[in-house]
Amino acid sequence: MDFSLLKPNENFEFEKYFDAIIGAFDTVGRKVKIQKKDKKVSSKVESAFLKDNTDIYNVSFQTEKAIKIKIEVDTNPPLLFDTENKLLLQPKSFMTRCFNLSDLFAGKMHALVFRAWGDRLKGRDWFDFEWYVRNDYPLNFEHLRERIKQFNRIDMSKDEFHEKLIERLSSANIGNVKQDVYPFVKDPHVMDIWSNDYFMQLAGMIKYK
């Protein structure tokens, strides 16, 4: 689970929320342990999007088999994003503050274009890209631009980003993209249309906020 502060705070301490988290799980009969995880990076793949300012925690609890939830907290987030409050009803009614979809779209496109995994492709980025375009959500380019500045040290215009996106979409091995997604979809035939040209045409349909 990914979380972000609303503004940078190098002194943020997630530990002070532990009691509240443990108590929330306890109300539904789950005993949990929370441990801060050391950020040991053994390869460039693992470090691709792991920032120095991201704290990582493991929340573990026991069901029929042990479940572990990884929580990441970005204490130095790229700015120029908007949030909204969403009502959830389970396990009890509560409000949660979320990035809006235009900013989540921006984060997804940053990952798709700049994720430095060599020959490995995270097909779920491509699946989500298709979902945002098909559902007509606009992309907040100003937030995307901030992400690129912070992660990649580049100040990129909209046209420059589009060129970089087309380069990525045209050169990727779509077979590898599909292989990463197959375990997560009920009907693999929904990806029959996927091709380099298909995604390049989707790129031309992106609406910017």
State where each predicted segment sits.
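A short glycine/small-residue-enriched secondary-structure motif
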Residues: M1-S4
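Structured mid-to-C-terminal alpha-helical surface segments
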Residues: L6-K209
